[in-house]
Amino acid sequence: MSAIIGSGIFVVPAAIAGHLHSMGLIVLVWVLGGVLTLFGALTVAELSSLLPQAGGPYVYLRESFGRVWGYMFSWNHFFINTAGSLAAIAVAFATYLGYFFPSLSLQVPLFSFSFSVLGLPIEIALRGTQLIAMIVILIATLINVRGVRLGGWVTNFFTAAKVLALLALIVAVFTSTKGNSANYLPWWPDHWSKELTSAFGLAMISVLWSYEGWTTVTQSAGEMKDPERNIPRSLLFGTLAIIVLYLAVNMAYAYVIPLDQMSGSSRIAADAAAVVLGPFGTSLIIAGILCSTFGTINNSFLSDARSMYAAGADNSFSPSFGKIHARYRTPHVTLIALGVWSALLTLSGSYDQIASYVIFGSWMFYGLTALSVIVLRKKMPDVPRPYRAWAYPYATLIFVGAAGWILYNTLVEDSRDAMIGIVLLLISLPFYFYWKGRHEK
């Protein structure tokens, strides 16, 4: 659960309320996003039980479509998705920490410079928030270099803390006399239009950002006990629990904050807490948000670095990335590289732009990973599968179709950022053929 419950649920409900102005549509988009996530989780669960090696989707794509596709996934996942998400979430952590230490929120940069890439303006600036974000990433790097047991303990602790914070907010809201069920009206729009379809698509992208991380448990499968049994169970029950939790949180937000006011909130969870709990309650909720964001950062290090480690161990990338620390038995080179690159990305300080890259790259490979179930049933029909995908092939094909729609919608609605994501992915190919040539020699 820690891989999914990050900063999104504390940020994106306000943006979704700005796209969809009726509570029924907001509930619908969260349910559909959760169902898609569940379909994907149930699909990936078969792959993780079939091929329970460390590396997750890298291994699935390599066995299904060839080594180059596994490598491209690892590149995208490591340098764009994981590092970009870590940078954005670390900046969010530092921003919320500024509630308790206002001096950390100073917006005057210590240094800055600007440039453009394919017409996209980029500012590199070191402010107090970026400096704290770098320190947080450094701490998470050191924790995970020390070993899976320590990193896993930290993840479990912060998962419990943030779930308790969300549950406390839900209970406080619905037992308060300060809410109003009239805030749920209008429940449904008077008519459906082309503009509403576009808005629903944009809201869905925000929802899927909040559900990001559902595959990460499979990527440390080689280091887990009994992965054939534990991974499918974790995906199924964890995803269902998060769907219910997210729906309850959104209903709680809207119960105390009207939709037209919700869309203008930058700290929706804190604002909801302030209505029913006052300043002290706001402090508690922000403490929960800090636990949530740090737990997500730590979990990404714990699981996501394994894909590039698998590529290094497979000689599809620099062999240094496949090295294991002699004492701690962790992929320390990969973890340190991820920490350094993520820390550098915090200098951009752009949460929204990074999210666009992450969603586009993620769902391209999520769709291919789901297709791997079909391919591997043809290529490996006799290999034992302790778990088989539920409602196959219908749930799998629905998920693949949804991934295709998300890519199309991103290309149409946010074409510039989507093209930048494609270019960044294609940059990986020269490196692949270089390392492949060196290995063959």
PLM features: residue spans?
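Select transmembrane alpha-helical segments in multipass membrane proteins
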Residues: M1, G66-F79, I132-M134, K194-V207, ...
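A generic transmembrane alpha-helix motif of multi-pass inner-membrane proteins
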Residues: G24, S356-Y357, G361-S362, V375, ...
